[in-house]
């Protein structure tokens, strides 16, 4: 009977969102599960964002064709007007916006202005190979202007890293548009091993163009190994992190990446192991991705009368589609849709904790804006996530007190990331500000809460945990990168702040802040990062529940092969 009471009490702790931060932290299974799922999703988002930014690193095509003009003269031309043929890609509005010719004494300057305006209308729509050809005057004395709008005759220069069929689908025989050409180049250059440039050559047919691609390809594989003490007290401080990626493994301009994070201290009694796999493939303006992650943990928790073994695992699989619906040399706007299935299993001394072990399926719709600004980059992502009943997702469990989690929740998330370089006192500084927030009217399962005290949120927390259904945090970092002989040295300071609120918690909004300072030293492919951080909770804690977070010293060493 005593065992049953202890177990029911534990289940209640896991299932109720109105607990205080420290009460939740005392039994950290749900924290481990949430951290594992959110860390793997963060790794996936960072890879996608990195590939998107990589597209804007390379200069896109910039072509300004020179129109064929008549030799300038002040004399009147022996014509009474003009007629235009061959136009199919311009609208009536485009044609009506052209400057009218004079009724009397048409000069070469008037004709040249008309040709330039026609060429400019094509360029405004992105048709970069359109040109105007002169025809002999007709029987009415009208000079002919014939628009050769141009089309793609063929594409040359593809290699294993540049699959022209997927990068430029259905482009052959179509009008050559700058946006289509830029999009294909951007998709090719999203792979770090590619540096693709393009030349447009005249084809053998009238109006035909040959797209000739050149690629300065580097090594397609990348391997990064790191060791740090960013782990948790319960499951292990020191971790070995490995990231391996390969560009175009199937010759489809595709991408595959594998991450593995494993704790190393006392692996037989306490551990946290996480693995994430991502695969993506382009098709014109679309990028399709599939991903999966698996993590497992184990640690021992001291209770009042005994020590228990807590362990569990999480599995996450999903598919995602991104579509770049607007782009230029300085910005990309993307729509994305993602379907994710999550399975969480938590155990208390071989007894499964059903209320903290849900199966969830979510569908997420988002819009992303990536903008290169003067001396900086701004990225914003807004998304709506809805839990659905697909793939065996569980129904919302019945809770007698009515304070249970909603397994059919809806939540809104906003993420912004701003990098800005600026000069001060004849030195260059870098400022980075990151905001993440979420809101849900529903009571979320614990794995969907927003946590302020994770290492990727407010810096400086080690023992306290603070999370909730709604909230947000802001991370600000000011750094000063400089070179010393062959070393790149970057000292930094950071200030973070955030608040969360749990549904049903009478305490309302609870917050915290963190202060940090760090130093990054890089020599060729090796990096050493040191950070000192201190976090504080900004709400009243009772003496029995009070947690004092010590000042943290974090160390990370990494090497890129």
Swiss-Prot record:
Keyword Mitochondrion among record annotations: no
Query: Which one of the record's GO molecular function terms can you name?
Result: porin activity
Q: Where in the cell is it found?
A: Cell outer membrane
- Gene3D superfamilies found in the cross-reference section: membrane protein fhac (3.10.20.310), membrane protein fhac: a member of the omp85/tpsb transporter family (2.40.160.50)
Q: Which GO terms describe its biological process?
A: killing of cells of another organism; monoatomic ion transport; protein secretion by the type V secretion system
The domain of life is Bacteria
| InterPro entries, per the entry | Hemolysn_activator_HlyB_C, Polypept-transport_assoc_ShlB, POTRA, ShlB_POTRA, TPS, TPS_OM_transporter
Q: Does the keyword Hydrolase apply?
A: no
Gene Ontology cellular-component terms listed: cell outer membrane; pore complex; type V protein secretion system complex
Which terms are listed as keywords in the entry?
Answer: Cell outer membrane, Cytolysis, Hemolysis, Ion transport, Membrane, Porin, Protein transport, Signal, Transmembrane, Transmembrane beta strand, Transport
Report the family membership: Belongs to the TPS (TC 1.B.20) family.
Annotated domain remarks: Probably a beta-barrel protein.
Q: What does this protein do?
A: Interacts with the cell-bound hemolysin. Necessary for the extracellular secretion and activation of the hemolysin.
Q: What is this protein called?
A: Hemolysin transporter protein HpmB
Q: State the organism named in the record.
A: Proteus mirabilis
- UniProt lineage: Bacteria, Pseudomonadati, Pseudomonadota, Gammaproteobacteria, Enterobacterales
Gene behind this protein = hpmB
């Amino acid at each position: 009977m005593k065992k049953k009471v202890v177990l029911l009490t534990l289940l209640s702790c896991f299932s109720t969102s109105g607990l205080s931060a420290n009460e939740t932290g005392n039994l950290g299974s749900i924290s481990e599960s949430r951290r594992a799922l959110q860390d793997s999703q963060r790794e996936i988002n960072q890879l996608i964002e990195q590939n998107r930014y990589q597209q804007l690193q390379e200069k896109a095509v910039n072509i300004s064709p020179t129109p064929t003009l008549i030799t300038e003269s002040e004399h009147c031309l022996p014509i009474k007007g003009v007629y235009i043929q061959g136009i199919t890609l311009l609208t009536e509005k485009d044609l009506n916006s052209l400057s009218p010719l004079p009724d009397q004494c048409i000069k070469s300057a008037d004709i040249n202005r008309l040709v330039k305006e026609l060429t400019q209308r094509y360029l405004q729509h992105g048709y970069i190979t359109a040109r105007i050809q002169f025809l002999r005057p007709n029987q009415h004395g009208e000079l002919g202007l014939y628009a050769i709008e141009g089309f793609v005759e063929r594409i040359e220069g593809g290699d294993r890293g540049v699959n022209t069929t997927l990068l430029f689908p259905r482009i052959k025989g179509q009008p050559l548009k700058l946006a289509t050409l830029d999009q294909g180049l951007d998709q090719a250059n999203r792979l770090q091993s590619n540096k693709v440039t393009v030349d447009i050559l005249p084809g053998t047919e009238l109006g035909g163009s040959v797209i000739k691609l050149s690629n300065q390809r580097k090594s397609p594989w990348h391997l990064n190994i790191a060791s740090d003490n960013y782990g948790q007290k319960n499951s292990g401080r020191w971790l070995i992190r490995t990231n391996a990626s390969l560009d175009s493994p199937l010759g489809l301009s595709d991408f595959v990446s594998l991450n593995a994070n494993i704790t190393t201290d006392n692996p037989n009694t306490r551990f946290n192991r996480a693995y994430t796999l991502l695969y993506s493939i382009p098709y014109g303006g679309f990028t399709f991705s599939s991903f999966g992650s698996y993590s497992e943990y184990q640690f021992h928790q001291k209770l009042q009368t005994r020590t228990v073994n807590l362990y569990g695992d999480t599995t996450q699989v999903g598919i995602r589609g991104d579509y770049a619906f607007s782009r230029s040399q300085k910005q990309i706007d993307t729509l994305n849709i993602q379907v994710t299935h999550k399975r969480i299993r938590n155990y208390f001394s071989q007894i499964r904790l059903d209320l903290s072990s849900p199966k969830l399926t979510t569908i997420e719709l988002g819009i992303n804006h990536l903008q290169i600004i003067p001396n900086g980059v701004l990225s914003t992502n807004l998304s709506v996530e809805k839990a659905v009943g697909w793939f065996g997702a569980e129904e919302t469990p019945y809770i007698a007190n009515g304070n249970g989690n909603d397994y059919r929740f809806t939540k809104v998330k906003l993420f912004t990331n701003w990098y800005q370089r600026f000069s001060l006192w004849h030195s260059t500084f870098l400022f980075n500000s990151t905001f993440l927030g979420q809101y849900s009217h529903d009571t979320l399962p614990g794995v969907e809460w927003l946590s302020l005290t994770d290492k990727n949120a407010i810096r400086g927390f080690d023992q306290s945990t603070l999370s909730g259904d709604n909230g947000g945090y802001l991370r600000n970092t000011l750094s000063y990168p400089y070179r010393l002989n062959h070393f790149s040295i970057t000292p930094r300071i950071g200030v973070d702040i955030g608040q969360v609120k749990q549904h049903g918690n009478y305490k309302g909004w609870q917050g915290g802040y963190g202060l940090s300072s760090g130093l990054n030293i890089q020599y060729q492919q090796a990096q050493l990062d040191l950070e000192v951080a201190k976090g504080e909770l900004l709400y009243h804690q009772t003496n029995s529940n009070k947690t004092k977070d010590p000042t943290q010293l974090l160390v990370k060493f990494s090497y890129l092969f």
